[in-house]
Amino acid sequence: HSHSEVSQISGEWYSVLLASDHREKIEYNGSMRVFVEYIH
């Protein structure tokens, strides 16, 4: 593999991991917000 191919694959995985982590945090915060409103 050339260096450019490795860099491209690493970049794609990095983007996927960032998107996944960001999505999970949004879902967690959203669930907690609904839970708190439900209690009050």
Swiss-Prot record:
Record GO biological process: sensory perception of smell
Record's keyword terms, sorted: Olfaction, Sensory transduction, Transport
InterPro entries, sorted: Calycin, Lipocalin_CS
Keyword Transport: yes
Keyword GTP-binding on entry: no
Cited PROSITE patterns: LIPOCALIN
Sequence intervals crossing the membrane: none
Membership in a protein family: Belongs to the calycin superfamily. Lipocalin family.
Task performed by this protein: Binds the chemical odorant, 2-isobutyl-3-methoxypyrazine.
Quaternary structure and interacting proteins, as annotated: Homodimer.
Protein name: Odorant-binding protein 3
Organism of origin: Oryctolagus cuniculus
Lineage summary: Eukaryota, Metazoa, Chordata, Craniata, Vertebrata
